Amino acid sequence: MQLVLIRFFLIFLLIWFFFSFFVSPSGHYFQYQEFTAELVAKLLNAMGEDHLWLYHGEYKTEIYARDGAHISVAGSGGQYPYMFFIAAVMAWPGGWLRRSAMLIAGLALLFSASVLTVLGAYMIDVYHPVQFDLFKKYIAPTALVSLVIVLFFTWTVISGAKPDFGESPVKPL
């Protein structure tokens, strides 16, 4: 079990380092945020919501409502739940085919949840602005982390593998 935890932390640190020093400074992450905002804008169009989507260069994308409410997509990407999920799945033992399928399916679900989180934040800011901070600071992050935990537990079942715990220090009677 300790080996799994060490692998998890090492993989997480590698992913965090790669994201912080290569992906984020290169501007590719902002393309992801722009794509997320564009999807939210399309969902708002499909729902018949009146809004204005503004792209302010590579650092900020905002969606405005008619009453002045707005959502900034910068910082709403949910990159840490992605990192935790990838590290957890990579650290737990299992076959590469199942692992690849789980990573693809899990990342797709996390992306969908991230888009719904931004959409939900917009709708709450428009219709229940008093509850916006509660949703943005507590409910949305808790929902994303809970999804990561459920996906990881699903992976532990699907993988069909268990880490080697070694010999138990407790002897049976």
Regions found by a protein language model. Give the residues of each.
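Hydrophobic N-terminal alpha-helices or hydrophobic patches in metabolic proteins across all domains
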Residues: M1-L173
